[in-house]
């Protein structure tokens, strides 16, 4: 079998439907035992002349799930929405609380995630 170049692969992917791509990603994850979870938030580059005083004000936060509460299934659903984890991974995260759900995200994203988790019945900490 001839080796396909990156351009050839991209051309093939362009012809696929979203459902076909989704099935491909699932098969790829199973074959190579990896996950294709997207990064939840990306921090912007730090300023070149960032002053040490800026360290006083925290701009990256972690959302820690401290407990699932009574509505564990709802919490698992919210964790999956926030992280793009699979069902098993999200369940393991919820069962293994306290665990970080999101790390190094902006204050707004951390607050929104914490609010969603609390609405589902989880106990959450933002650090």
Swiss-Prot record:
CDD domains noted in UniProt: Ribosomal_L7_L12 (cd00387)
Keyword Ribonucleoprotein in annotation: yes
GO BP annotation list: translation
Native species: Streptomyces virginiae
Assembly and interaction partners: Homodimer. Part of the ribosomal stalk of the 50S ribosomal subunit. Forms a multimeric L10(L12)X complex, where L10 forms an elongated spine to which 2 to 4 L12 dimers bind in a sequential fashion. Binds GTP-bound translation factors.
Keyword entries, A-Z: Ribonucleoprotein, Ribosomal protein
GO CC terms of this entry: cytosolic large ribosomal subunit
GO molecular function, one term: mRNA binding
Top-level division of the source organism's lineage: Bacteria
Function (record text): Forms part of the ribosomal stalk which helps the ribosome interact with GTP-bound translation factors. Is thus essential for accurate translation.
Protein name: Large ribosomal subunit protein bL12
Keyword Ribonucleoprotein: yes
Family: Belongs to the bacterial ribosomal protein bL12 family.
């Amino acid at each position: 079998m001839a080796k396909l170049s990156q351009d050839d692969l991209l051309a093939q992917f362009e012809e696929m439907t979203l459902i076909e791509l989704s099935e491909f990603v699932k098969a790829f994850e199973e074959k190579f035992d990896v996950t294709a979870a997207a990064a939840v938030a990306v921090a912007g580059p730090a300023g070149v002349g960032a002053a040490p005083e800026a360290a006083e004000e925290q701009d990256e936060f972690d959302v820690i799930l401290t407990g699932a509460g009574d509505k564990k299934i709802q919490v698992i659903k919210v964790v999956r929405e926030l992280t793009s984890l699979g069902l098993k991974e999200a369940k393991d995260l919820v069962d293994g609380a306290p665990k970080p759900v999101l790390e190094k995200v902006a204050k707004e994203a951390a607050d929104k995630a914490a609010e969603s988790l609390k609405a589902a019945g989880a106990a959450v900490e933002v650090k």
